[in-house]
Amino acid sequence: MSDWTPSLYLHFAAERSRPAVELLARVPLENIEYVADLGCGPGNSTALLHHRWPAARITGIDSSPAMIAEARSALPDCQFVEADIRNWQPKQALDLIFANASLQWLPDHYELFPHLVSLLSPQGVLAVQMPDNWLEPTHVLMREVAWEQNYPDRGREPLAGVHAYYDILSEAGCEVDIWRTTYYHQMPSHQAIIDWVTATGLRPWLQDLTESEQQHFLTRYHQMLEEQYPLQENGQILLAFPRLFIVARRTE
């Protein structure tokens, strides 16, 4: 599991794209020239940006070679760069930095967010969506299984919180619009939940395990999911998925 798997990620393309659509709807920009899509993945969010601003110069950034290859194939009119978000430097100030479900993987948000604001043009916008599910059973159980089986903690850190992000971005010279939404995704089975998180949040926990260790981990994880996520009357499972949204406009 050394690289991301675009096909697995896109298995839930509609569910993963919906937050990007709703984030983009709140971006208060019309005619813009330079856009960066940070953590563009296979290009599903980049396609939304290209549709809204077809004349803009859009650059997608991702550290995964497989994701970049998929995005280039899907969107030949956009530029894609394989790079670490923390180190990438645009050649010009950006009118929009769009980061859908990517910045939660990076540490030091107290430094990262002001840095991203510094890359914006005057009145430029930083638009961010991050999964806020560190305390949800899906992620709590990952940590519990790892503890039970004596595996190292590979999970990401929790988000800083609404008040912290507001202060960080206000102090960086931005007007801040921030909100939190919980989606309830209808899942046909507990295995479907595993398929969902295997493409994202579960990857760090599995990537250094042997095949037999992975199977042992997933078997126990499946058992614990069954305890935490009961079936609805129609046999479906409702997967609660909180997400944090931020639209920060530079005023300085």
Curated annotation (Swiss-Prot):
What are the entry keywords? Cytoplasm, Methyltransferase, S-adenosyl-L-methionine, Transferase
EC numbers on record: 2.1.1.144
Q: Where in the cell is it found?
A: Cytoplasm
Show the GO MF annotations: trans-aconitate 2-methyltransferase activity
Q: Which family does it belong to?
A: Belongs to the methyltransferase superfamily. Tam family.
Q: Say yes or no: keyword S-adenosyl-L-methionine present.
A: yes
Question: What biological function has been recorded for the protein in this entry?
Answer: Catalyzes the S-adenosylmethionine monomethyl esterification of trans-aconitate.
Q: Which GO terms describe its cellular component?
A: cytoplasm
Give the source's domain of life in one word: Bacteria
Give the protein name, as stated in the record. Answer: Trans-aconitate 2-methyltransferase
Instruction: Quickly give the catalysed reaction.
Output: trans-aconitate + S-adenosyl-L-methionine = (E)-3-(methoxycarbonyl)pent-2-enedioate + S-adenosyl-L-homocysteine
